[in-house]
Amino acid sequence: MILKAGPNFSMPGPDRDAGVTQIIWRHGKRNLALRAAGLMPIICPIADGSGVCGVSVFDATPEDVERIMALDPGVQAGVFTFDIHPTRSFPGSCLPASDAGSLTI
């Protein structure tokens, strides 16, 4: 799933609406709960100003991902939009345990 900036998105900084900041915190907490439940094992925030805000890998059908993301507080508030791209992986694929800050997509 590719998370993108929605019409109500704003970059972090002193001019960001406090309501947007709260929505993004709720979105992040929800993502961590989805990870803990095994539904979204890989979460990759992107903050390069490109309009792409993140990439996540779900362990769910595209239909289930659509339902899950439709309930996301950031999506509901128009802060984010998303695209679903069904994919597959190789058994055992995972992120390295080393410094996650060095990964590039």
How would you describe each model-predicted region?
Residues 1-105:
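Conserved, structured core segments of small domains
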